[in-house]
């Protein structure tokens, strides 16, 4: 019996595509309508029918409120993140119970995952008709800058569609895999510029001897062809209002007509200098019906969309920087996604990388082809290819002083596993709270919360004694798992970051931009937090030493120590960096003198004070558990384990 096939699916914002390995080569499969790509559109009718693909697109104008397109732009996102996006679609976007997103239709309410599942089912059926047997497994692609929640939501969509998603891979990585599949002996550095219907990614890879290694990735999860269409549509609305005084943006069916006309105009302007937009009977007033008839030139199109094209520049520059390469060191630039046909986009790519982009791949199919190749690797049909991808954003936890302690840096090769050992920050602490974060900023509050959980039942002990190992594990799909384990008792708590919401493109872009713009500010905040942590630790230790060794010290020594402790606490309350540094240094001198005196009296068999693990290290953030007990994350020492 032959091996089970693992198909490759490009689940796109505008169109989707499916491919499979046949006879050692990837084959793009035609759907039942005879097309190699399928519109990612799902429609619901009053009769209870569900229509997917081209037929759904055909009836969109007459059934706009029940036709869901571009659902990928909502997947894994919170309702409050979708405000601007929801205003630009013809269907109704509502809040789900978990603060996620749902679409309201005549057939009921549906999540973005459910809509994506309908498209995946169409892809599954297309493959089954071609292969002549049932398909159960697939590799599904996502934008490289999709966060954990969006990846998990995509995997959930596959499960809803009846597919085991064997691997989630990044779209530009899949494109590179397809480009280099027949060039495995070639050693090259390539950039993949992927501007699709709803997302933009750029990845830098090294190819050689069948190894496809991603060096860096960057992007914008809310930038694509839809945005170009929306700009053109808004221009049409504004122009019509100037001509007639009528605002036609309020009617859903009219908006759908405008959207389709804008997309058509955009496509035509990739090959002509102007296009005529004609929509008869677009609206009516007391004087009778009104028709929309206007000309859009390529020059005007370039003018109104220039800011969108420019938004792709900084991610390209940052990707090169993270990869440690200059533009001149890139051998090939591969263009992916339907929106790369826009001449201004191609011109910008040439300007950034200093060379003509490579147009040898089909931008609509190459991602599905790469997914099929990866499916062949997983099925054992392809044996001479190794894919090494990366995680796009840093991951860590909050530690004392509101600091983000990164366990996994962005652009780390996945799968990976890293651990750090923490301890308690208070005597008799029985619970440790773990606040999981994603982002590039130094301070926790400037990053995004992915989840929180508590490890309870820690035996009462002095601060610094319990050993709590926190482990981050990112699998090959880029999905995050976090655990905390008390090494003393073996008690463990785990969390998988759930897919109730996702990052908007603005948030991700802002994370990296803010990290660069506020680098100096973050450095000062981090230094203040670390200094306060050090001061708190040494105050605690000196106070403990005095209490335990009072009989070995005279009154003047004890009084001097108490005065230093008081000044240290006052410095911590002030938050002034220089004052805390001075107090820390002064207390260290006093503590050293007292320690030497106690040690000289005690003899060599006893250890010097301040020897317990973790003293003076960064510590965790405070809170309370369900019983009102103090919960504080604490000290750490680094224990890295890389599973590449």
UniProtKB/Swiss-Prot annotation:
Task of the protein: Acts as a chaperone.
Protein known as: Chaperone protein DnaK
Region (Disordered): 550-586, 599-644
Induction and repression of expression: By stress conditions e.g. heat shock.
Species for this entry: Leptospira biflexa serovar Patoc (strain Patoc 1 / ATCC 23582 / Paris)
Keywords carried by this UniProt record: ATP-binding, Chaperone, Nucleotide-binding, Phosphoprotein, Stress response
Keyword Electron transport applies: no
Gene Ontology molecular function: any one: ATP-dependent protein folding chaperone
Protein family per UniProt: Belongs to the heat shock protein 70 family.
Comp. bias regions, Basic and acidic residues: 550-584
Record PTM Phosphothreonine, positions in chain: 199
Composition bias type Low complexity, residue spans: 600-623
InterPro entries to which the protein is assigned, alphabetical: ATPase_NBD (IPR043129), Chaperone_DnaK (IPR012725), Heat_shock_70_CS (IPR018181), HSP70_C_sf (IPR029048), HSP70_peptide-bd_sf (IPR029047), Hsp_70_fam (IPR013126)
């Amino acid at each position: 019996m032959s091996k089970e096939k693992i198909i490759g699916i490009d689940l796109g914002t505008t169109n989707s595509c499916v491919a499979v390995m046949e006879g050692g080569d990837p084959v793009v499969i035609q759907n039942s309508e005879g097309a190699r790509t399928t519109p990612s559109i799902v429609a619901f009718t009053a009769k209870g029918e569900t229509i997917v693909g081209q037929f759904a697109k055909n009836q969109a104008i007459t059934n706009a409120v029940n036709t869901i397109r571009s659902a990928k732009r909502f997947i894994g996102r919170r309702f409050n993140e979708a405000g601007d996006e929801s205003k630009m679609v013809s269907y109704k976007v509502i809040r789900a119970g978990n603060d996620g997103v749902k679409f309201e239709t005549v057939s009921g309410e549906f999540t973005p995952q459910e809509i994506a599942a309908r498209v995946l089912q169409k892809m599954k059926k297309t493959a089954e008709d071609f292969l002549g047997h049932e398909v159960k497994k697939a590799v599904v692609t996502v934008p490289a800058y999709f966060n954990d929640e969006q990846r998990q939501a995509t995997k959930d969509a596959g499960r809803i569609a009846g597919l085991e998603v064997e691997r989630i891979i990044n779209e530009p990585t899949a494109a590179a895999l397809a480009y280099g599949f027949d060039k495995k002996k070639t050693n090259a550095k390539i950039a993949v510029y992927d501007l699709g219907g709803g997302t933009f990614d750029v990845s830098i890879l090294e190819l050689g001897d069948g190894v496809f290694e991603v060096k860096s990735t960057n992007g914008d999860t809310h930038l694509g062809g839809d945005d170009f269409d929306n700009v053109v549509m808004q221009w049409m609305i504004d122009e019509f209002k100037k001509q007639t005084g009528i605002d036609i943006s309020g009617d859903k069916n009219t908006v759908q007509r405008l959207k389709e006309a804008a997309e058509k105009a955009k496509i035509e302007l990739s090959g002509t200098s102007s296009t005529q937009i004609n929509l008869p009977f677009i609206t009516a007033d007391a004087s009778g019906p009104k028709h929309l008839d206007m000309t859009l030139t390529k020059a005007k199109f370039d003018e109104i969309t220039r800011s969108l094209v420019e938004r792709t520049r900084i991610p390209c520059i940052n990707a090169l920087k993270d990869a440690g390469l200059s533009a001149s060191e890139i051998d090939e630039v591969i263009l992916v996604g339907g929106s790369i046909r826009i001449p201004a986009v191609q011109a910008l790519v040439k300007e950034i990388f200093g060379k003509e982009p490579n147009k040898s791949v089909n931008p609509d199919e190459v991602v599905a082809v790469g997914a099929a190749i990866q499916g062949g690797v997983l099925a054992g049909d392809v044996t001479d290819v190794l894919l090494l991808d990366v995680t796009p954003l840093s991951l860590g936890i909050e530690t004392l002083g509101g600091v983000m302690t990164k366990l996994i840096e962005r652009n780390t090769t996945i799968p990976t596993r890293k651990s750090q050992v923490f301890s308690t920050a208070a005597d008799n602490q029985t619970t440790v709270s773990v606040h999981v974060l994603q982002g590039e900023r130094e301070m926790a509050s400037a990053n995004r919360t992915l989840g929180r959980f508590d490890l309870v039942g820690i035996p009462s002990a002095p601060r610094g004694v319990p050993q709590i190992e926190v482990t981050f594990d990112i699998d090959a799909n880029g999905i995050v798992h976090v655990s905390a384990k008390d090494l003393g008792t073996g008690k463990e708590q785990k969390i998988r970051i759930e897919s109730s919401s996702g990052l908007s493109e603005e948030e991700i872009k802002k994370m990296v931009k803010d990290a660069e713009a506020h680098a100096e500010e973050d450095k000062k905040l981090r230094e203040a937090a670390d200094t306060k942590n050090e001061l708190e630790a040494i105050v605690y230790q000196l106070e403990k030493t005095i209490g335990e060794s009072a009989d070995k010290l005279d009154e003047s020594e004890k009084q001097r120590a108490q005065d230093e402790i008081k000044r240290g606490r006052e410095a911590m309350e002030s938050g002034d960096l220089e004052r805390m540094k001075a107090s820390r240094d002064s207390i260290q001198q006093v503590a050293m003198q007292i320690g030497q005196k106690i040690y000289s009296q005690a003899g060599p068999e006893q250890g010097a004070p301040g020897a317990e693990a973790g003293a003076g290290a960064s510590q965790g953030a405070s809170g309370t558990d369900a019983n009102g007990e103090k919960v504080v994350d604490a000290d750490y020492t680094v224990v890295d384990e890389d599973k590449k």
